Regions:
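Short, aromatic-rich membrane-interface segments at the entry and exit
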Residues: 42-47, 114-120, 138-142, 163-169, ...
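Acidic (Asp/Glu-rich) catalytic motifs at the cytosolic membrane interface
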Residues: 57-85, 134, 140, 181-189, ...
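Alpha-helical transmembrane segments of multipass membrane proteins
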Residues: 30, 34, 103-107, 125-129, ...
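Multi-pass membrane catalytic core of lipid/isoprenoid biosynthesis enzymes
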Residues: 70, 75-120, 166-177, 213-220, ...
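Hydrophobic transmembrane helix module of multi-pass membrane transport proteins
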Residues: 121-149
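Topogenic membrane-insertion module of multi-pass membrane proteins
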Residues: 1-74, 87-99
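Short, amphipathic, aromatic/basic-enriched membrane-interface segments that mark the entry/exit
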Residues: 14-21, 83-94, 111-116, 134-142, ...
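C-terminal membrane-associated helical module and adjoining short loops/tails
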Residues: 1-15, 132, 150-301
């Protein structure tokens, strides 16, 4: 018997399907605003529009992903409750929503610039390739995920018309690779705890858990090393009055990465580290501390 919820999914069901809680990832477009110190009305406005464009297109991608993985998700201990997998939203309605979301996303992108539209198109092409193929290839999947995060940073720079920083790109790539590996670690740990077999839609074995954890930590610490090298670069002297203060960011970042991995090992982190970070009190305090240190480094002597 079909329930009323399945016949008439409410706004909460649709918001869950659109993964509105994941929109925090698209705030990465603001990173170039912060690192370039472009706190103007124009820069912030364009960054907001860019964030909205990515959010709409990301929702379309999530919809496509769930349509492709609907059978596998129905066998997953947590993903089976997703609206499409559970039947709360009909697959037909999901297919209709995809072009609508994409049209709204690119209409927003056109307000920013044609270059931004091209970056958004590249993001969609890569994420589509990820959904169809790359997500099933060991390690290729996490590298592509890191690239998808980094593309958001690139898009943010293009949206506000500032040069791309090689330091920022290198830091972003390693940091996001670490987060992607943590996500895979959490997924494998969940399957082990529920006595599930090796994932059918991922090219990982349950025995890979330890090495995936090691790769996550090493990639995260590489990001910290890149940040430390950045502090000694000439670019820092042009942007910060007190660059020596930025050294304090290194131990804070090291602490957060190590703690996140330990919590993942203890099964105290959900499958997505970024979503975990915005709900975790210690992570929020850590982020606030880093922001305070950056502001102090910017302040005049």
């Amino acid at each position: 018997m079909v329930t009323a919820v399945r016949q008439n999914p409410g706004i909460i069901t649709w918001l869950k399907q659109l993964r509105v809680h994941q929109y925090v990832k698209n705030s990465l477009v603001f990173l170039p605003v912060v690192t370039s110190h472009q706190f103007t009305y124009r820069a912030i406005s364009f960054a907001l529009i860019a964030c909205a464009a990515f959010s709409l297109c990301a929702s379309a991608v999530y919809m496509v992903n769930d349509l492709l993985d609907i059978e596998a998700d129905r066998q997953h201990p947590k993903k089976k409750y997703r609206p499409l997998a559970s039947g709360a939203i009909k697959p037909l309605h999901g297919k209709i929503a995809v072009p609508v979301l994409l049209a709204l996303g690119f209409a927003s992108a056109a307000v920013v610039s044609s270059e931004f539209c091209l970056v958004l198109l590249a993001y969609l092409a890569l994420t589509t390739a990820y959904s169809i193929s790359f997500k099933r290839k060991m390690l290729v999947d996490v590298v592509v995920l890191a690239m998808l995060y980094t593309i958001r940073v690139i898009a943010g720079a293009i949206a506000i018309s500032v040069p791309l920083s090689a330091w920022l790109l290198a830091f972003s790539m390693f940091m996001f690779l670490s987060l992607a590996l943590m996500k895979r670690y959490s997924e494998l740990a969940l399957r082990i705890d529920h006595n599930l077999p090796d994932p059918s839609n991922r090219n990982y074995k349950l025995d890979d858990l330890a090495i995936v954890g090691c790769l996550a930590v090493s990639s995260g610490f590489n990001a910290v090393t890149i940040f430390a090298l950045y502090i000694n670069s000439s670019a820092v002297e042009q942007l910060y009055a007190r660059p020596e203060v930025l050294w304090l960011v290194c131990p804070v970042l090291t602490y957060w990465i190590g703690r996140a991995m330990i919590l993942a090992h203890r099964r105290m982190m959900n499958e997505d580290p970024i979503v975990f970070a915005i709900k975790d009190r210690v992570s929020l305090i850590t982020g606030a501390l880093i922001a305070a240190l950056v502001l102090l480094a910017m302040s005049k002597k």
